Amino acid sequence: MKENFNVSKLKNGLTILTYNMPYVHSVAINLIAKVGARYENEEEEGISHFLEHMAFKGTKTRTAQQIAEEFDSIGGYFNAYTGHENTVYYARVLSENCHKALNILADIIQNSIFADEEIAKEYQIIMQEIAHHHDNPDDLIYETFYNTVYKGQPLGKSILGTTKTLVTFTKEHFLNFIGKHYNAENLYLSIAGNIEHNKIVMIAEELFASLKQGVKSSFIPAKYIGGKGFIHKELEQTSLVLGFECTSYINLGQLYQTYLLSIIFGGGMSSRLFQSIREKLGLAYVVGSYNSAYFDSGVFTIYASTAHNKLELLYREIKNEIIKITETVSTEEIIRAKMQLRSNLQMAQEQNTYKSEEIGKNYSVFGKYILPEEIIEIITNIRADDIINTANKIFSGTTTLAIIGPNDLNGF
């Protein structure tokens, strides 16, 4: 409900967003920094993710152990993650411990010390993360896929960075990056749960007043390139990822048309890919589709794994299904897909972790809170022709194909 949502802006520009859920006992906190891997230049590749790792390694007032102990003492859960477009620090605690959790979070964001020994230690941990990533066929094929989709662009590069850049990072690098991006205009504090907005604003004024106003960060616009990427690796199966350019998340009408297309095409057990490729032909255990959306671009992705000698047949059958969905979509498929989308959206409204993410993302992207009812209306008004037109627009574009396996793949 809109009356449960409130927004305020501090004098320094920090945006405070709350959604009151009086029937729960906890609060979910998200501090969103509008900076991620796509904001990095070549010398900074991996620094957003590295910085997120360093958030728990000590501040001017707390050691790393004290940070861990203080969160454990209030029974809280605290973590962070890095994407291409933002970095998010989040916590979930009982409502009575919200002030304490925000105190720790504010300390981490504003007062981390980046000790040399902790940087060296975390560098080794991230190197292990990269090694694990390269040993995982799924991670490897998607890295190759996005490198091909956005060739030579920050949006196509791994958030983990490379050995070449990571080894160079010092305390000064982290402080400079924070100074450039972690300012009040570039941060959004979103909280959902059993809270009062005015109290949260007062706490935020106390804890975040020293943040400089700064300016919003910018990035280089993405351009879909496409092409082919092959990885030779001795595996039990060969996997492929097939992609096409689709809408960004800015156009909500097109975005939800694409969501519905993805559900019908490869979004579950009743989807066309699952029924054809797995149930009817027995070509794959894993097969499906989804779409990834960014501020200025998007990718519709189809994935599957099969026996080495079935790869060409699998690829051919996927292409056949693509042709079919550009021609017709049944009423039953649309009803089923709409119900899946609506159910997921409405059931998520009951979770304060989801609401905190939702209001934060809405406001950081659109500058407003988009009501669930508005989204449901968009979904309800989508027709079969809309989905068919979306399918034709997407599948007539440049193809990206990534394959990993032991075979000679030059024929593709």
Curated annotation (Swiss-Prot):
MF terms (GO), sorted A to Z: metal ion binding; metalloendopeptidase activity
**PROSITE patterns (alphabetical):** INSULINASE
How cofactor binds (record note)? Binds 1 zinc ion per subunit.
Pfam families given in the database record: Peptidase_M16, Peptidase_M16_C
Active-site feature positions: E52
Gene Ontology BP, a term: proteolysis
EC primary class: hydrolase
List, separated by semicolons, the cofactors it needs: Zn(2+)
The record lists Zn(2+) as bound by H49, H53, E129
Keywords from the UniProt entry: Hydrolase, Metal-binding, Metalloprotease, Protease, Zinc
Reported EC number(s) for this entry are 3.4.24.-
UniProt similarity note: Belongs to the peptidase M16 family.
Q: What is this protein called?
A: Uncharacterized zinc protease RP219
State the species of origin: Rickettsia prowazekii (strain Madrid E)
